[in-house]
Amino acid sequence: MVSWIISRLVVLIFGTLYPAYSSYKAVKTKNVKEYVKWMMYWIVFAFFTTAETLTDIVLSWFPFYFELKIAFVIWLLSPYTKGSSVLYRKFVHPTLSNKEKEIDEYITQARDKSYETMMRVGKRGLNLAANAAVTAAAKGQGVLSEKLRSFSMQDLTLIRDEDALPLQGPDGRLRASPGSLLDTIEDLGDDPTLSVRSGTNQADPRTEISEDDTGDKAPKRVKPIKKVPKPEPPASKTLKTRPKKKTSAGGDSA
């Protein structure tokens, strides 16, 4: 454990921070020799970091593994050994020169495939997100409509309960609630006989109003009243009376 901590400190301080500062100085002074030296070091150190990630998993159990790693980093940095320059000239540069074209082709193919994969995955992700948003909105709308429906039913029950209670007017008398009046009006509206009567009653005032309106607009003509002569009682018919025959006494006396 102690050797692992020491090796990590050595790699961070001597393998990363010190070369980074030296590279800054080389860029600042525009010293081509130092610039080339530290560029070779960073190329070798990149391969070392990649190999270290694998060897820490596989060879960490090996005795003196971390001590050997510390010694290797010091060998790379030492101005006497110039390990980074030796490794670059003998191994790294010849290998990269032989495989440069293949590496470039792999890089271009990987870039194109990664771009296509990213576009495909992005489109699929957008479709999934849109579908999820639509389903969530539909579910939310359904829940909201159910809640509104439940609230409306509760309000209706409350209104019916309030309608059942009689209201007391200012004069102390009980009066029907407006809800009950509405119910009775609806019931009367449903009755066909009452609807017919109401239709006739509604039609009569219109005619009366129209006649009154016409009377107001055009003055009525007053017909002169003719005096009807009173019928005279019929003359009594004279009864024809037959003359009485003279009595026979007068004849006898003659």
From Swiss-Prot:
It is found in: Membrane. GO terms for molecular function: microtubule binding; taste receptor binding. Keywords: Membrane, Phosphoprotein, Transmembrane, Transmembrane helix. Residues 205-219 have a biased composition (Basic and acidic residues). Its main location: membrane. InterPro entries: TB2_DP1_HVA22. Pfam families: TB2_DP1_HVA22 (PF03134). The chain crosses the membrane at residues 1-21, 35-55. The modification Phosphoserine is found at residue 152. GO terms for cellular component: cytoplasmic microtubule; endoplasmic reticulum; endoplasmic reticulum membrane; endoplasmic reticulum tubular network. Signal peptide: none annotated. It comes from the Eukaryota. Residues 164-254 are annotated as: Disordered. It is a multi-pass membrane protein. Residues 195-204 have a biased composition (Polar residues). GO terms for biological process: endoplasmic reticulum tubular network organization. Interacts with odorant receptor proteins. Belongs to the DP1 family. Required for endoplasmic reticulum (ER) network formation, shaping and remodeling. May enhance the cell surface expression of odorant receptors. This is Receptor expression-enhancing protein 2. The gene is REEP2.
